[in-house]
Amino acid sequence: MDISVVIPLYNEEESLPELYSWIERVMKANNYSFEVIFVNDGSTDDSWEVIEQLKATSGETVKGIKFRRNYGKSPALYCGFKEAQGEVVITMDADLQDSPDEIPELYRMITEEGYDLVSGWKQKRYDPLSKTLPTKLFNATARKVSGIKNLHDFNCGLKAYRKKVVKNIEVYGEMHRYIPYLAKNAGFKK
């Protein structure tokens, strides 16, 4: 399988059908074999029911993992990583701020340019200044402390990994923000 898309989510019932359709269009247009793994992190809305509907209508491309309560993004990613079968694992948020149209470029960078990890970067943010300013400060500090100088947005949910990266790191607590650093410490270079 070419690509696994892991999508952690909490209360995203309205965006899931559009997100899956968008991903499916991109995958089919590029002839990728793929799976989409939705990890429902204890949603209190009808997200799980929507995932079940997508599973019923998509053949074998949709998988769902359901948490009984909200454990957080790191455990959701970790469980998705454990299930992922694709040679490239892509993560994205379910809120439609990450564009599935970026998947072919992320895939190309992993498979053709030899990167182990590629991170997206939200150049245009649709968040208030009260959120964007602390994010910029966090990213500057994280770059300095981690030594990863060319990563602009540690918090961006859109990332691509070679499968061996996600199979060789443990993500827990709030460590999802530091997956690039964990990968670097595990010996992955590019």
Regions found by a protein language model. Name each.
Residues Y32-S43, I65-K66:
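Short beta-strand/loop segment that forms part of the nucleotide-sugar
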Residues N40-E49, L96-Q97:
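A conserved acidic beta->alpha catalytic loop
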Residues V89:
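Short aromatic/hydrophobic "clamp" motif used to bind/position activated sugar donors
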Residues E14-E18, D45-L54:
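Acidic helix N-cap motif at the loop->helix transition within catalytic regions
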Residues D2-S4, E35:
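Cell-envelope/extracellular polymer assembly enzymes that use nucleotide-activated donors
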